[in-house]
Amino acid sequence: MSFPKGFFWGGAVAANQVEGAWNVDGKGPSVADVATYKPNTDVKDYKSHVAMDDAHIAAAMADPDDTYYPKRRGIDFYHHYKEDLALFAEMGFTMLRVSIAWTRIFPTGEEAQPNEKGLQFYSDLFAEMHKNGIEPLVTLSHYEMPLALATKYNGWVDRRVIDCFAKFCHVCFERYKDQVKYWLTFNEVDSVIRHPFTTAGIIPSRVPEDKMLETCYQALHHQLVASAMVVKDCHDIIPGSKVGCMLTKLTTYARTCAPDDELATQAKNLENLFYADVHVWGEYPRLILKMFERKGIHVEMLPEDAATLKAGCVDFVSCSYYMTMTESVDPNAERTPGNTVLGVKNPYLPSTDWGWQIDPKGLRYSLIELYDRYRKPLMVVENGMGAKDVVEADGSIHDPYRVEYFRQHISEMGKAIDEGVEMWGYTTWAPIDLISASTNQMSKRYGFIYVDQDDMGNGTLDRSRKDSFYWYKKVIASNGEELD
């Protein structure tokens, strides 16, 4: 197993899950700031956790507290980033994926001028990253947008949001052109279908149920057009820049070799891949357009959109990978949740406490599939497992389950490289404990670094190294050769 020289090793976080300081230095409210922690809701009931309507938004904005709105506080990375970057550097990180909070730069999304304090924060962050030998990989939209655009326009459903986003991105490219080379446009762009408010600011209660799917695809189209526009803008402003797309890689297996199961599985995989298809090839696959037609889905596309998509193709493909799915036409097949998706349970795979099935070989399968399809360099920019960690009396945190998870996944990633897949880097989700995207929990811990904070926001916020911290440090130092 041989990882290439210069391979990027690191971790990934999102502004809305780590920064906190939700109303500090001119930042406006984002859709993430009204996401609620629901302690009495089953953690596997993802649909209930991501539900949203106007009444909920109004109640949230009337409540200045952050107790039940954990993304308002995050882990206070806004004030702790130097400490955290020093820990990442100690592990040997050569890349850190972060996102820029749109509402730090344009609080409502429609200001004439950007917020200088917000711009300066990221200038300082990127400078500190370079000081620590860490290359920034920056996501421009990671599960947040100005709440004002969601309530005024129903988010990305309205085409006017494209120009708001393009302006935000243009400002970022101009400001950080000497600090950031690697960019991603939208995080898990496919997830608008699964959680429309989180991903695209769509308030579901405003949309008739029989029009919800069409509405999601309309918002998605606007995001795809916006992505193409900003890819071209980035290339124009930053010579040598590399801009990628990012999808949730949900490879689906057939439960049986029955032809009906195989056909259902094929449909799932085509759906999962089409989001990257548009980013890479600059056009919608014919099979997807026919699917729209069969389902009576009308997506309004302007005549000039085709040329825009063609002119803004990405340089590389990135993905999150947590699990695989299984498909069956049998309505009685046992099902299991995971990553906001309900699928058929795979009897050959173990599961996390949150129902996510663990499949290291599925990562290898997925990377080979992606590279064979696109012939573009790949990055895995999210991979990890949420678990409940225990702090021992002496302060130590033993997490052999996390080490084993990463050992197996990194091993399979290395095998994919040996088989010919071109990969640029790997950033784990997440290198430090943070607020969960779906359930808004703190107790669902991903990090190599423990953060002393509970689900209700109690704790010192002190950082401490888990056993996995030292293990990943060894992996990076050996460029992936030492996994024991």
Task: Put a short name on every predicted segment.
Residues M1-D65, A89, T108-E110, L119-D484:
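Active-site region of glycoside hydrolase catalytic domains
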Residues D66-H80, V157-R159:
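Active-site mouth loops of central-metabolism enzymes
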Residues G74-A86, P107, G118:
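Internal amphipathic alpha-helical repeat/solenoid segments
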Residues H80-A101, A311-V317:
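Catalytic domains of carbohydrate-active enzymes, especially glycoside hydrolases
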Residues I100-P114:
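Glycine-rich, proline-tolerant flexible connector loops at the mouths of alpha/beta enzymes
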